Amino acid sequence: IDTTDYRSITPGWILYNYPEVEFIIKLLRHTTCKESCDYCHTQLDVLHNLKTFFGYERFRTYESEPLQERAAQAAVKGKSLLAIFPTGGGKSLTFQLPALMAGHSVHGLTVVISPLQSLMKDQVDNLADRGITDAVTINGMLDPITRSLSIQRVQDGEASLLYISPEMLRSKTIEKILMARHVVRFVIDEAHCFS
């Protein structure tokens, strides 16, 4: 594992033979210790990373409640949550920021399940417009070369966000990819796609 490259991932054979390794790495790299710790401030603080990744000084509030920040912080802490925001209310940020943070700190992969291929493409394109190239989508609309490149980016640890449709969960290719990566969370974007 190349410790100087945040995209370096634990080899699949280690994950297969020693599955507890990822848990230990997560404990070591994803547990806050004290206020003065530089690592905790730069790697685990949601406000610091909001500025680093997205250039925002603060999260949105709703009727003076920091709901967006609470949702992002809960995800960073590994809690399961249900976040309901209005259209355009910043819901995507609540899973994208923790996904990027986990990608950098524990080489984790966040799988986002979304019913619309156009929405997946928009999400990946919007992140790319911000200079964030950690997201890919794998879906039936991709030409074979683009699909192959997306798969390779996930396998090589270059992607920390993978957008797929619910149907793709049945794909043997997707299953193989996910088994070889440390999946830190699944996000259901538009919960009605599982009804």
Predicted regions and their residues:
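N-terminal accessory nucleic-acid engagement/regulatory domains that precede
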Residues: I1-C40
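Conserved pre-motif I regulatory segment
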Residues: E35-P86
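Short, flexible loop segments at the rims of nucleotide/cofactor-binding pockets, characterized by
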Residues: R58-Y62, T87-G89, T137-L142, L162-I164
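Short loop/turn elements that form and flank the Walker-type P-loop nucleotide-binding site
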Residues: V76-K79, S105-H107, G131-I132, Q155-E158, ...
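Conserved helicase ATPase motor motifs in RecA-like P-loop NTPase domains
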Residues: P86-G89, E190-F194
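Conserved helix/coil segment N-terminal to the catalytic DExD/H
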Residues: L100, D125, L142-R185, C193-S195
